[in-house]
Amino acid sequence: MVSQVLTVCTANICRSPVAEAVLRAGLPGLTVRSAGLYALVGRGIDPEIAETARAQGIALHDHAARQFDDTIGREADVIIVMETHHRQDIGQRWPQFLGKTFLLGHFDNARQIPDPYKQTAGMQHHSVELIAQCSRTWIHQLEQMTR
């Protein structure tokens, strides 16, 4: 049974906190957290991404970036990453977690979520939109798993 979900990106200041917020809102019975493989520990969500997410109706919470590690990985029942290289990195560094690590776009044709950090407003909007879309698909799938 799934009770804890972890979203992971590179720095934990853009994609994974937005996915965390969408999943948390849609799955109130689950614990949803986020982390970064190369986290900018303690930093909040990038202000431009936060503004873009809020404009799309995503309610963000207070956030401080945290580093993915063995303990965080062990606590999660499902680890959701943004790009294939994140999954590969986890598999190389923590092979014990590879079997529970999936792309956010897993159910959307294995779609990759491009890194919006310091990109154009259009790219940021597109990335946040993809995160919301793929997160909604995960919400549906996780609801089926927890019944």
Regions inferred by a protein language model and the residue ranges of each:
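Hydrophobic packing within well-folded, soluble alpha/beta domains
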Residues: 53, 79-80
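Conserved active-site segments centered on acidic
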Residues: 1-74, 140-147
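Hydrophobic beta-strand core positions in alpha/beta domains
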Residues: 7, 80-81
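Phosphate-binding/catalytic loops
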Residues: 78, 84-147
